[in-house]
């Protein structure tokens, strides 16, 4: 998915709060260093103007250890309205918001790569 989006000039946006945000920043930096267009945007920044960056076909990866983050729950709806591909990384398999995402990576004990 990432390679396909990259070859079509699309961007991967990564978002998460707290420690998940730290992981997201690191991941965006690592992907950029190997030539994949990636950028970290904090969840609250999306609702304060950053949604304008998104183009149809872009991907947003949402990272949350618990999956119980109200800001991320609101964002998923905004991304879906704009036809944005969503990927979730979560440590909690039972979170209902994961069902709304296009792809999910679940890691029980530890989320961090």
Region spans (language model):
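A short, well-structured juxtamembrane/interface segment
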Residues: 1-8
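Glycine-rich phosphate-binding loops that contact phosphosugars or nucleotide phosphates
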Residues: 11-17, 21-113
């Amino acid at each position: 998915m990432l390679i396909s989006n990259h070859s079509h000039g699309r961007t991967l946006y990564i978002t998460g709060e707290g420690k998940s945000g730290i992981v997201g920043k690191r991941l965006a930096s690592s992907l950029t260093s190997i030539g994949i267009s990636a950028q970290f945007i904090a969840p609250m920044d999306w609702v304060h103007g950053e949604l304008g960056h998104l183009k149809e076909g872009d991907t947003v990866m949402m990272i949350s250890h618990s999956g119980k983050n109200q800001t991320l729950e609101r964002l998923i709806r905004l991304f879906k309205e704009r036809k944005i591909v969503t990927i979730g990384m979560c440590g909690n398999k039972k979170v209902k918001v994961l069902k709304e995402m296009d792809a999910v990576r679940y890691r029980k004990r530890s989320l961090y790569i």
